[in-house]
A protein has these predicted regions:
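Short glycine-/small-residue-rich Rossmann-like dinucleotide-binding loops
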Residues: 63-64, 87, 192-194
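N-terminal Rossmann-like NAD(P) cofactor-binding module of classical short-chain dehydrogenase/reductase
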Residues: 59-60
Length: 253
């Protein structure tokens, strides 16, 4: 069984992970970290991770950027692997994460969904077939009207997976409104839609002469990210120092 400290346990994602772990005999949350203590959990909750005195195999972090430094310090000091799901880190924090790779196991991915990460692997293979055959590649991502960034980090990660497979020969185009020229064969177009309560939808098109191949992933709730984090925690238990991602989790299955 994998014993977990859930940092950000009383947030939406923390509570979703709590419920998933209750139904899984192979993993258990043994302690939580959260400033807000208004939820009755079946594990002890501490206001900060440095106050936690419970032994664990892995830390799952779904909190906020301000808390990440303390989490990293704790995990390095205690030699506890960490699944780092918090986004919006500063350049200084990202540099600190890079340093932590040398000292403890850290799993960090642009998207925790098993589906998205499987899609990335499929796109690498598809690009190697379709790109040399002259197919154009476009990505369309859709999210709710409260999302601040565009394009999404996941859309960029999908584009990167294609580009990596093609020796980084492609550049990204986000806006064609100011251009009056033919499409560059070496571009990947990325378009963003914002509306309603769309959790997350990503579509990748390979457009050739007389045929179009589409890959699509739709997230109907944020539970897909929570499930991925749980699988990542199981995978990370006992791992040595280094940078891991969801591709490693999928490869191990």
């Amino acid at each position: 069984m994998t014993k977990v400290i859930m940092n950000g346990c009383n947030g939406k994602m923390g509570q979703t992970i709590t419920e998933i772990c209750k139904a899984d005999a192979d993993i258990k949350i043994v302690a939580g970290i959260d400033l807000y203590d208004g939820i009755d959990n079946d594990y002890p909750v501490f206001s900060s991770i440095d106050k936690c005195d419970v032994d664990a195999d892995v830390v799952i972090d779904f909190s906020n950027a301000k808390a990440v430094d303390g989490v990293l310090d704790y995990c390095v000091d205690k030699q506890v692997p960490v699944v780092l799901c918090t986004t919006g880190l500063s350049d200084e924090q990202l540099a600190k994460v890079e340093e932590c790779y040398k000292k403890v196991a850290v799993l960090k991915s642009a998207n925790m969904s098993l589906g998205i990460n499987t899609l990335m692997a499929l796109l690498k293979k598809a690009a190697q077939v379709f790109a040399p055959a002259g197919f154009d590649m476009e990505i369309v991502e859709k999210h709710h009207n409260l999302k601040l960034d565009a394009p999404s980090g996941t859309a960029l990660a999908l584009a990167d997976s294609i580009n990596d497979a093609m020796d980084n020969e492609y550049h990204y185009v986000y806006d064609r409104s100011q251009r009056r020229e033919k499409r560059d064969p070496k571009e990947i177009g990325i378009s963003a839609v914002r509306g309603g309560s769309i959790v997350g939808e990503h579509e990748v098109l390979f457009c050739g002469q007389d045929e179009v191949i589409e890959f699509k992933h739709t997230a109907y709730s944020k539970a897909v990210f929570a499930k991925g984090a749980v699988e990542a925690a199981k995978f990370l238990k006992g791992k040595g120092a280094g940078h891991y991602d969801m591709a490693d989790v999928i490869a191990a299955k």
